[in-house]
Amino acid sequence: MDRLNQLSGQLKPNAKQSILQKNPDDVVIVAAYRTAIGKGFKGSFRSVRSEFILTEFLKEFIKKTNIDPSLIEDVAIGNVLNQAAGATEHRGACLAAGIPYTAAFIAVNRFCSSGLMAISDIANKIKTGEIECGLAGGAESMSTNYRDPRVAPRIDPHLADDAQMEKCLIPMGITNENVANQFNISRERQDEFAAKSYNKAAKAVAAGAFKSEILPIRSIIRNSDGTEKEIIVDTDEGPREGVTAESLGKLRPAFDGTTTAGNASQVSDGAAAVLLMKRSLAEAKGYPIIGKYVLCSTAGVPPEIMGVGPAYAIPEVLKRTGLTVDDIDVFEINEAFAAQCLYSAEQVNVPEEKLNINGGAIALGHPLGETGARQYATIIPLLKPGQIGLTSMCIGSGMGSASILVRE
């Protein structure tokens, strides 16, 4: 009997082998694309709102993938700054783009993970048999919403002085200062990390590395005299050449500390989406399968140091899948701030050469609700067939999320 048990154990696939297996019920990725990311307030999307960006993007997404829109049974779009997370206008954007009204819609807001939560929502619906095909993504216009006073939380006066409530209201930049102070992450290390992000992104742009993931879309620039100009947006506006730790070191801190405009993510506009299907449906319809969604995990952390979220979410998703850091070939950890990303990556022992290979949000920008989906569009081209990728981000009010996918 012991010998039989031993042989049985040898025949069972390990966690990595199991994840790489292909099954008819798998949630597969048929396509993942994004817009170029526009600079907030002065970039190519500054005159249009998120629903315009999303409509134009989805039109191009449908055209590029040649998907039959009638197959789409549900759409989940992440957004942070619109009222009600864009529930009305983003549903309208889907219809305007050619997705039929028969496709249901849900607006998702879990701060910076909203795009990933949209992917998780659609993937879980496919896993449970609710649907067989869905579209997940995110859209954000920080140019039009970032300074809107209506976005600020309004707290009941009876809770305004509650200590726990106050922690959830701490500005994100201050939480990053808390991380830097608590874990002794110097200004110099933050600037070095940020400079590497800029340099990697600049090289990627020069090499055309992002062209396969970006769908050029139409935008409109409104001039001061009221005239309008139509343009095509096809290149990220955040990356720039020649950034060094020394040049970043000359920037003044945004707060009383070490966080600057140079070592924090950029205010940005953009959209991204991932088309997910049940494997058996994708194969039956002849759609290409470029990846497989595996799992997403979210972990809570102290709100006052919310940036450490990936340091908790990544071990959680690895534990639930039985994988190790060594099993992961590429990591995309959102660079909300240099200090928090640097801390999280080091806590999990992420090899530097596997982290944000083409730069991250410090150089590219961070349209809040879009980032989680953007990471999928970015990481898939970086993976070879059979390799495993991991995406992660911190989340305002004290959380972190991480997900695992396989390239096929």
Swiss-Prot record:
Keywords: Acyltransferase, Fatty acid metabolism, Lipid metabolism, Peroxisome, Transferase, Transit peptide. It catalyses: an acyl-CoA + acetyl-CoA = a 3-oxoacyl-CoA + CoA. GO terms for cellular component: peroxisome. Signal peptide: none annotated. It is an enzyme of class 2 (transferase). GO terms for biological process: fatty acid beta-oxidation; phenylacetate catabolic process. The active site is at C112, H366, C394. It is found in: Peroxisome. InterPro entries: Thiolase (IPR002155), Thiolase-like (IPR016039), Thiolase-like_sf_Thiolase (IPR050215), Thiolase_acyl_enz_int_AS (IPR020615), Thiolase_AS (IPR020610), Thiolase_C (IPR020617), Thiolase_CS (IPR020613), Thiolase_N (IPR020616). Pathway: Lipid metabolism; fatty acid metabolism. The keyword Acyltransferase applies. The keyword Transit peptide applies. Its EC number is 2.3.1.16. One of its GO terms (molecular function) is acetyl-CoA C-acyltransferase activity. Belongs to the thiolase-like superfamily. Thiolase family. This is 3-ketoacyl-CoA thiolase A, peroxisomal. It comes from Candida tropicalis (Yeast).
